[in-house]
Amino acid sequence: MSPWSWFLLQTLCLLPTGAASRRGAPGTANCELKPQQSELNSFLWTIKRDPPSYFFGTIHVPYTRVWDFIPDNSKEAFLQSSIVYFELDLTDPYTISALTSCQMLPQGENLQDVLPRDIYCRLKRHLEYVKLMMPLWMTPDQRGKGLYADYLFNAIAGNWERKRPVWVMLMVNSLTEVDIKSRGVPVLDLFLAQEAERLRKQTGAVEKVEEQCHPLNGLNFSQVIFALNQTLLQQESLRAGSLQIPYTTEDLIKHYNCGDLSSVILSHDSSQVPNFINATLPPQERITAQEIDSYLRRELIYKRNERIGKRVKALLEEFPDKGFFFAFGAGHFMGNNTVLDVLRREGYEVEHAPAGRPIHKGKSKKTSTRPTLSTIFAPKVPTLEVPAPEAVSSGHSTLPPLVSRPGSADTPSEAEQRFRKKRRRSQRRPRLRQFSDLWVRLEESDIVPQLQVPVLDRHISTELRLPRRGHSHHSQMVASSACLSLWTPVFWVLVLAFQTETPLL
């Protein structure tokens, strides 16, 4: 899930105490569903070739909040494509284990050993408050489905004293009432990954967990302490009733559904990164904030978009006869130096596909019975997966290769072996921990007490790594995403996931 974007922090700002009364307008995310398909907002772009491939901008929120507003041609493009790529492989157990490892302090170290005493005590006090409030924050529907407060708290904050400070900061920002209430329903990108797997599509990822994780771990200690302190200040102000959050997940959903997300982002900063430098900060803290801003812009936006774009290009050239559906955080397609810009510089024609425009079918394929939109995408009642104390089985069976070498129907080429996707075993035991338990939603973090630009995108990543035939966790890495896909604060991170049923998220 990111971030995973994987993970971008939501920029929140500290406002005068009197402004707090404005908090929590519940109807802000509501948007009237347009009667005509052509009136819906579209986050679909077509890569013009035969067969065509597509970019689709996702958002890291429960899919049920946005699904009815996604145009039919976007859903049809998903069905028509034989290969679906995400920022990260949200269904691969390796993603979970890699996230866990990335977030942990070196062996033998604990937070109490590395944090200043006053910050550690404030952090511990805040987590005790959250644990106390968790039963009150949960909805009757969540409790009715067997989700318990203690389980949920431990799934999110378990072993927090062993985590690196930067990940604790992100964790704190995912332990809010709004986020807790949203758990139990897959976020949009995870839902698409589950559907792709259910439909036996070949899937892959353009990024690896490490690519989203390492940039965050690359911040120096003083920068991380600055960010964690600002985060705790914000949460303490929220508890005291003196803080108003100007942009929330509800606002993000409204902008995504109603079609003004781009204008919101671009009106703040065309580069998608918030100018989170607060003029009220002391001079030295302003310098620290500027350093973080510069580092995150470079590592999490510009370098990432360039890397993802080149990996997409490599896939398109490797398999010219295959139709791809690339589902990345919508923030990757907005502003300057986007993934779209990278592909266009490489000579590809990429155009926006408005809602209501028919999808080009491309080369004729063997006739086969294909599910309809109504049967595939009928929203289902989400089921909560309760982890059992058993480990994931490492075995799996593989699907037949979807890519055939010209002139050889039996012998798979080396390229074919790269893109085989494992099929999840139907009898696999439940996982001990879930993807959402490990990713932290960056979208709603706020490191600097000042509102910045909302940025959608929740995942980040690194090197090109392709699985070999028979590779157990089969993490096909040719790029990645998350999605971190929400808002961006001083501390841009990944939104592949640590929040909803599986952000960052």
From Swiss-Prot:
Disordered as annotated region, ranges: 389-428
EC number: 3.4.-.-
Glycosylation sites: 220, 229, 278, 336
Transmembrane domains' residue ranges: 478-498
Entry's Gene Ontology BP terms: head development; negative regulation of Wnt signaling pathway; positive regulation of protein-containing complex assembly; proteolysis; Wnt signaling pathway
Regions of this protein lying in the Extracellular compartment: 20-477
Cytoplasmic compartment residues: 499-505
Cofactor section: Mn(2+); Co(2+)
Keywords from the named record: Cell membrane, Glycoprotein, Hydrolase, Membrane, Metal-binding, Metalloprotease, Protease, Signal, Transmembrane, Transmembrane helix, Wnt signaling pathway
Cofactor, how bound (note): Divalent metal cations. Mn(2+) or Co(2+).
PANTHER family assigned to the protein according to its UniProt record, in alphabetical order: METALLOPROTEASE TIKI, METALLOPROTEASE TIKI1
Protein's name according to its UniProt entry: Metalloprotease TIKI1
Source organism of this protein record: Homo sapiens
